[in-house]
């Protein structure tokens, strides 16, 4: 089920207006297929698998949480995600969704923890890496953000949001070459992306 990603920086002034705007566009313009955010069948889990009924109940709670999140009922959604994770700690969908809610409340370390858990369960997916990178940017952990984004573009090279956010990370690291390359790739995928276009110009990118 695809749901809009919540706004991650309702008051994140420490990123500065330019960075906040870029990251907001990077995430708010996309929808994530959370229903497919589940571990591969052959992945071993460090925790004992819960009983079948617990897994089903956890998935039902996660689905309710998504519906509540779409309706703007953040507290109720968080309660459902907490319940889902208590029933099934390996529910990557609930972990990722809860991470987005924490991110929307600027609780970025909690978001990082949830995205890390979701990534451990679904290492083939780019979404938890992108989410964690955004929170790392808010925490001024720019190198960690760049590392996540490097991995994310390998997992989903057609995702313009990831390339735009990677451009921000490398721009903040002072690597204009990688920033320009990232912004340029975002523009190739989404030519009307004004954030990527202005970032590309800002770092002195040359049209190829």
Question: Whereabouts are the PLM-identified features?
Answer:
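Helix-start (N-cap) detector for alpha-helical repeat units in TPR-like alpha-solenoids
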Residues: 58-59, 92-93, 126-127, 160-161, ...
């Amino acid at each position: 089920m695809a749901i809009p990603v919540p706004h991650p920086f309702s008051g994140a002034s420490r990123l500065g207006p330019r960075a906040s705007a870029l990251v907001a566009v990077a995430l708010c313009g996309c929808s994530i297929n959370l229903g497919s955010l589940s571990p591969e069948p052959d992945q071993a889990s460090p925790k004992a698998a819960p009983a079948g009924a617990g897994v089903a109940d956890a998935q039902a709670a996660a689905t309710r949480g998504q519906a509540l999140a779409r309706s703007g009922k953040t507290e109720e959604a968080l309660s459902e995600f907490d319940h889902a994770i208590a029933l099934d700690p390996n529910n990557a969908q609930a972990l990722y969704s809860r991470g987005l809610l924490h991110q929307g409340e600027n609780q970025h370390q909690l978001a990082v923890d949830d995205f890390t858990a979701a990534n451990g369960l679904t290492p083939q997916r780019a979404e938890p890496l992108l989410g964690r990178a955004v929170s790392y940017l808010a925490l001024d952990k720019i190198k960690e953000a760049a590392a996540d984004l490097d991995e994310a573009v390998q997992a989903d090279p057609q995702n313009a949001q990831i390339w735009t956010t990677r451009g921000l990370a490398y721009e903040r690291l002072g690597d204009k070459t990688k920033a320009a390359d990232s912004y340029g790739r975002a523009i190739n995928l989404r030519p009307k992306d004004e954030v990527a276009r202005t970032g590309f110009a800002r770092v002195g990118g040359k049209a190829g």
